[in-house]
């Protein structure tokens, strides 16, 4: 009779290494913003799209805190990009920010990927 230890070991390893990763919002090249954030800006005729990846270590998982920080970083980056171009954008509607969350239980890293469209003020 064969030992099932290798199969059980593989299944346990797969379960332990499983993690949820957020869905990427863009294929554009990301630029580092700070130690937790990277972003990409895609020009549009009516403004630009901003996509960010935000992640940080959390001993106790609080996805809502990471989601709030992620949306805040996205908003700040959008206004900074507009300021650098010497233009103003319409206020970002938080309801239109697409967001995806994930957590790696082994490393304690909670991640967020978000995207929003910033429209130029007329």
Question: Language-model segments: which ranges?
Answer:
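Bacterial N-terminal signal peptides that target proteins for export
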Residues: 1-8
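Secreted/extracellular ectodomain signature
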Residues: 20-122
């Amino acid at each position: 009779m064969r030992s099932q230890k290798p199969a059980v070991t593989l299944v346990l390893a797969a379960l332990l290494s499983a993690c949820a990763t957020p869905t990427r919002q863009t294929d554009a090249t990301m630029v580092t913003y700070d130690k937790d954030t990277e972003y990409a800006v895609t020009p549009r005729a009516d403004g630009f799209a901003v996509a960010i990846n935000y992640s940080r270590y959390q001993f106790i998982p609080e996805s809502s805190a990471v989601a709030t920080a992620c949306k805040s970083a996205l908003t700040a980056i959008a206004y900074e990009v507009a300021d650098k171009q010497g233009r103003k954008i319409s206020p970002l509607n938080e309801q239109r920010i697409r967001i995806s969350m994930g957590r790696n239980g082994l490393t304690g890293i909670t991640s967020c990927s978000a995207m929003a469209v910033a429209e130029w003020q007329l």
